[in-house]
């Protein structure tokens, strides 16, 4: 069975904020650049429209710092970078993700042979 883009989005919903923090951990980026970085790392179905609500929440929660820079031929771009709180949240989130992923893998491994 092929994973549909909709199902992939549902599965990513809980961890996309971690992925966004990861791609702006060391170098700031604006929205389009962030989606490009995510795609380069394998998240091909993530679009700009799906990240902006998350970026707004990350900014409100103090997990990203922002600044604006002029762009060629357009309005200024808003750049995002992980704040110190964002770095801590990312580290904690990665630990939690690995723990949950391990638990889910354990459950699915028990039935994997019978499903394949």
Regions found by a protein language model. Name each.
Residues 22, 36, 56, 91, ...:
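A cross-family signal for key residues in well-ordered alpha-helices
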Residues 8-52:
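N-terminal helix-turn-helix DNA-binding core of bacterial DNA-binding proteins
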Residues 4, 88-116:
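Amphipathic alpha-helical dimerization/coiled-coil segments
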Residues 1-9:
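Short, Lys/Arg-enriched N-terminal segment that forms or immediately precedes the first helix
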Residues 82-86:
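Accessory beta->alpha helical hairpin/"wing" motif in late/C-terminal subdomains of nucleic-acid enzymes
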Residues 61-73, 81:
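Beta-hairpin "wing" of winged helix-turn-helix
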Residues 52-59:
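Short, hydrophobic-biased segments on the C-terminal half of alpha helices
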